[in-house]
């Protein structure tokens, strides 16, 4: 049912197999409103979406059991994968629905949905007592539904609830993770937080939930429809998303970009090359009648979301998902806050970061966030352990620490071996590593600016050099350090060493 094809961090490129086709993840499900849909499903497909989601409760309200007789694919005129939500959003907005859990489940079966959701109780942004009740009732309903859904041909989703109460999120996920008759999991109630750009709450909920969910099952994030959240949620293990944001924003004259949402009246230029933006100017869009403007803005918003999904997939394929997180963190203050939180999850994310992927393209490092890039931090930790083990084995001698520039010339490692001294290299982000490890990925594949590195990065390097010097001296080595004062990062590292418990380290300037 779910085939994982590629992994970086906890993000996956995968395939969800359904009765009406295959969904390649990460994937976005545009919400189709059966009451009011300014963009046709054909246009949705043309924008790159072979899957959509619609609300089963609203289908029932409009068509009753007639929709079940025709089937949801025929009602929508959509031949691809259709996911149906149960009406939980209406509970969140209006306090209830007229259908029972059993009726909602049976209705989705008869609709012929490919992916369906039980009638859960969304938490939203409520007090602790209400949140506890939403989790308890959702769990009760999830257990109750077993006799109705076990063995069913469609994929049933277990909704994880708890909102901003992360212990409740974990409890909900822990129970759901043990219910094997659910072949997909959904994390609910993020919309109220996403609307306020409280992305840090959403990613924390995802992180807490994923700890208890089976690795081999896809995970859906309900109500997430902005490109700013996609890379972080995917990096934590979310596979699919849905939202009506593309059309809701369009109705208000709002224009989605990868770095925020603009009102069309505030734009003089369109920073996009999609079919809509290539044909029209902001002024032309503003002068259109409301219906046509809404349709075109919605199409643009869909194209942006589609492009964002492709960008995330490519980053996974290249092993550069962390670098995409860094890039996104500089697009909005809310994502900068999320990035700070992502560094706390590094142990969990590191497990999915392949050691050799992206060797041809290398690793790009920029600043403080790059220190937590799993491919760099893992090499640094491994190198430190290797230095200590080799120093212990050799039991003394002469050691010299030499700088290694980004992307050194081929053969540079070998050219420095010999002379009766043990050669160790040092680099920003990677720390100190022996010549024997020079060439191991990514020591020769890292690229970073040689000027203007943040003080924290230089301080981190100085600290790692000082630690290495202490280890070597403790094993009977005499140590000196070479540097080139003309190279800014090297000169700054030597200066920083004066306050890093290695002020007495002999240094020799050696340029060229």
Swiss-Prot record:
Annotated binding of Zn(2+), by residue: 272, 274, 277
EC number: 2.4.2.48
Cofactor(s) recorded in Swiss-Prot or TrEMBL: Zn(2+)
Binding note for cofactor: Binds 1 zinc ion per subunit.
Keyword tRNA processing: yes
Keywords carried by this UniProt record: Glycosyltransferase, Metal-binding, Transferase, tRNA processing, Zinc
GO cellular component, one term: cytoplasm
Gene3D superfamilies in UniProt: Queuine tRNA-ribosyltransferase-like
Protein name per its UniProtKB record: tRNA-guanine(15) transglycosylase
An example Gene Ontology biological process: tRNA wobble guanine modification
Pathway as given in its UniProt record: tRNA modification; archaeosine-tRNA biosynthesis
UniProt-listed SUPFAM superfamilies: tRNA-guanine transglycosylase
């Amino acid at each position: 049912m779910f085939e994982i094809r590629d992994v970086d961090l906890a993000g996956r490129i995968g395939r969800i197999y359904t009765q009406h086709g295959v969904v390649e993840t990460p994937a976005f499900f545009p919400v189709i409103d059966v009451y009011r849909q300014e963009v046709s499903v054909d246009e949705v497909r043309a924008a790159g979406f072979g899957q959509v989601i619609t609300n089963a409760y609203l289908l029932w309200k409009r068509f009753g059991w007639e929709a079940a007789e025709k089937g949801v694919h025929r009602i929508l005129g959509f031949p691809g994968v259709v996911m149906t939500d149960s009406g939980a959003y209406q509970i969140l907005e209006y306090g209830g629905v007229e259908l029972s859990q059993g009726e909602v489940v049976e209705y989705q079966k008869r609709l012929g949905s490919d992916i369906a959701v039980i009638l859960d109780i969304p938490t939203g942004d409520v007090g602790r007592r209400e949140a506890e009740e939403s989790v308890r009732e959702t769990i009760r309903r999830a257990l109750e539904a077993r006799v109705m859904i076990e063995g069913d041909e469609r994929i049933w989703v277990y909704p994880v609830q708890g909102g901003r109460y992360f212990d409740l999120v974990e409890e909900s996920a822990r129970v759901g993770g043990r219910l094997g008759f659910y072949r997909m999991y959904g994390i609910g109630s993020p919309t109220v937080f996403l609307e306020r750009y409280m992305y840090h709450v959403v990613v924390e909920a995802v992180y807490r939930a994923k700890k208890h969910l089976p690795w081999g099952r896809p995970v859906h994030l309900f109500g997430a429809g902005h490109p700013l959240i996609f890379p972080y949620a995917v990096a934590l293990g979310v596979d699919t998303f849905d939202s009506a944001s593309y059309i809701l924003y369009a109705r208000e004259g709002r224009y989605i970009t990868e770095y925020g949402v603009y009102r069309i009246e505030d734009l003089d230029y369109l920073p996009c090359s999609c079919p809509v933006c290539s044909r029209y100017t902001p002024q032309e869009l503003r002068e259109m009648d409301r219906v046509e403007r809404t349709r075109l803005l919605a199409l643009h918003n869909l194209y942006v979301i589609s492009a964002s999904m492709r960008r995330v997939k490519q980053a996974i394929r290249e092993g550069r998902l962390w670098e995409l997180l860094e890039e996104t963190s500089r697009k909005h203050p809310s994502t900068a806050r999320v990035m700070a939180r992502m560094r706390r999850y590094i142990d969990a994310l590191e497990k999915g970061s392949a050691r050799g992927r992206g060797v041809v393209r290398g690793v790009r490092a920029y600043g403080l966030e790059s220190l937590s890039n799993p491919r760099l931090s893992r090499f640094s930790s491994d190198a430190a352990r290797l230095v200590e083990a080799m120093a212990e084995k050799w039991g003394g001698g002469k050691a010299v620490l030499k700088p290694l520039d980004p992307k050194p010339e081929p053969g540079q490692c070998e050219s420095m071996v010999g002379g009766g001294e043990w050669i160790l290299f040092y680099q920003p982000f990677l720390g100190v590593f022996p010549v024997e490890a020079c060439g191991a990925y990514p020591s020769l594949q890292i690229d970073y600016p040689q000027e203007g590195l943040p003080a924290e990065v230089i301080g981190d390097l100085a600290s790692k050099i000082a630690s290495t010097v202490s280890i070597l001296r403790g094993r009977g080595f005499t140590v000196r350090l070479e540097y080139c004062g003309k190279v800014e990062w090297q000169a700054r590292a030597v200066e920083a060493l004066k306050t890093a418990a290695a002020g007495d380290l002999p240094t020799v300037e050696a340029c060229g």
